[in-house]
Amino acid sequence: MADLRCTIGGIRSPNPFWLASAPPTDKEYNVRRALEAGWGGVVWKTLGEDPAVVNVSSRYGAVSYAGQRMAGLNNIELITDRPLATNIAEIKRIKQDFPDRAIVVSLMVPCVEESWRAILPIVEDTGCDGIELNFGCPHGMSERNMGAAVGQVPEYVEMVTRWCKQTTRMPVIVKLTPNITDILAPAHAAMSGGADAVSLINTIQSITGVDLDAMTPLPAVDGQGTHGGLSLIHISEPTRPY
């Protein structure tokens, strides 16, 4: 059998196949099933400060293409809507039960030094292998001056990355937003701030369709809609310099 062991940003893993931060990595039972199936690691769904956000429902929209139904999914989900303590306890159990797997925790808090320095020791105490700074969420959180609102300003990317590197022993991965004219700028900023790696990419702003009766983007909730995220490979340019 081939040896697929690898080290990514200082994080060891039995294979390079990881689940990205997303709805499937929001709960212990989902992550446990994935690791039992052989995945080499997971990035836990983005954690934030308490009180937890409130997610709407339904928050998914389907894209059909060339006669194929549900060729892609759009989502307007925010970060985890569960209490921080609940996630922390589950992450700790997962790492104890799967010590050889890469467990990375995605984080998003206000662009305030005290907020970042406060949450890092809590996450580090789980025994996880690293953190991912979510600078890419294109909807819901950017309106709160988080997510893509940080990722679109290279100076902020470098500043927050440096705060985290000064505070934690864990490897720091920076997740970039593609919703920017030149993705190289925040990539350079992350590396200047000391990032151990960059993660490509967060979701691209998109509209899957329009409810012609309500004249709102899909998915629509209570007669209202918004643009959401649609994943797309966008990795060539940022990888060339490194």
Q: Which stretches of residues belong to each language-model region?
A:
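Active-site entrance/lid segments in N-terminal catalytic domains of soluble metabolic enzymes
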Residues: 3-13, 18-24, 28-193, 200-229
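Single conserved hydrophobic/aromatic residue that forms the stacking wall/gate
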Residues: 233-242
